[in-house]
Amino acid sequence: MDLRDLKTFLHLAESRHFGRSARAMHVSPSTLSRQIQRLEEDLGQPLFVRDNRTVTLTEAGEELRVFAQQTLLQYQQLRHTIDQQGPSLSGELHIFCSVTAAYSHLPPILDRFRAEHPSVEIKLTTGDAADAMEKVVTGEADLAIAGKPETLPGAVAFSMLENLAVVLIAPALPCPVRNQVSVEKPDWSTVPFIMADQGPVRRRIELWFRRNKISNPMIYATVGGHEAMVSMVALGCGVALLPEVVLENSPEPVRNRVMILERSDEKTPFELGVCAQKKRLHEPLIEAFWKILPNHK
């Protein structure tokens, strides 16, 4: 079996969506289908049940998923072991984070890591912060910078970097939304909101609605990516609740079109940190990265 086919199969087994997996694995849908067909021919069994809307694993597919996870993990461990036979650490370390985190938190960490391990090649992928935890769980990333969810997956280790301030932002330039929020007591049930489509930030705005007794909020849009939320607020589409660091690292022309209405006073802090699979913390590259984190003990 080809390792690339196993990686593709594993992603599809998690996403249950051919188009999404094809984009994530940088292949065409037809290439992805051929890879799955190749595996099915090797095993002599169908791996998925497909219809127009859903993709589900067969019993053989479930068994192959376990095999693929174990095989790819063992291969990664073998690569790391071989890499360590040289005089210093080498190999590739795959990191996932948001564009904001790539500016705000990752550089000083990478500076320390590269000073100690200059032969390690960093492969950085940026995307929606809400996807960070899943990237680690599925093995698409070795490490990720992520907001800590209410319930941390049992298989994931989390090292905190910072407690982030969360702010409610609105358009600063004259527009109907600014007029709505500029009164002494805004009617929040009529104000359009820009929301994260998933993740800890989504949970924060839901708590904010509950605290302000807004049972039926007006949702203008749900967005993947906190940076896009700032842009939509700047355009006058609505208001949004998000980590202040996202606003601070937005381009100045966008930042200047936004104002802060309030800072969240939630008792539970918004924790940002680095996450990795617990079972992989002993791998030399991940272990070395983990040790240089500021709150490592």
UniProtKB/Swiss-Prot annotation:
Signal peptide region: none
Subcellular location(s) of the protein: Cytoplasm
Molecular function per GO: DNA-binding transcription factor activity; transcription cis-regulatory region binding
Record feature DNA-binding region, as residue ranges: 18-37
Gene3D superfamilies: Periplasmic binding protein-like II, Winged helix-like DNA-binding domain superfamily/Winged helix DNA-binding domain
UniProtKB keywords: Activator, Amino-acid biosynthesis, Branched-chain amino acid biosynthesis, Cytoplasm, DNA-binding, Repressor, Transcription, Transcription regulation
Transmembrane segments: none
Record flagged with keyword NAD: no
Ranges for domain HTH lysR-type: 1-58
Keyword Isomerase attributed: no
Highest taxon above the source species: Bacteria
GO CC annotation terms, alphabetical: cytoplasm
A Gene Ontology BP annotation from the UniProt entry: amino acid biosynthetic process
Family annotation (InterPro entries): IlvY_PBP2, LysR_subst-bd, Tscrpt_reg_HTH_LysR, WH-like_DNA-bd_sf, WH_DNA-bd_sf
PANTHER family tied to this protein: HTH-TYPE TRANSCRIPTIONAL REGULATOR, HTH-TYPE TRANSCRIPTIONAL REGULATOR ILVY
Function, in words: This protein activates the transcription of the ilvC gene in the presence of acetolactate or acetohydroxybutyrate. IlvY is also a negative regulator of its own expression.
Family of the protein in this entry: Belongs to the LysR transcriptional regulatory family.
Record NCBIfam families: PRK11716.1 (NF008722)
The name this protein goes by in its record: HTH-type transcriptional regulator IlvY
Protein's organism: Escherichia coli (strain K12)
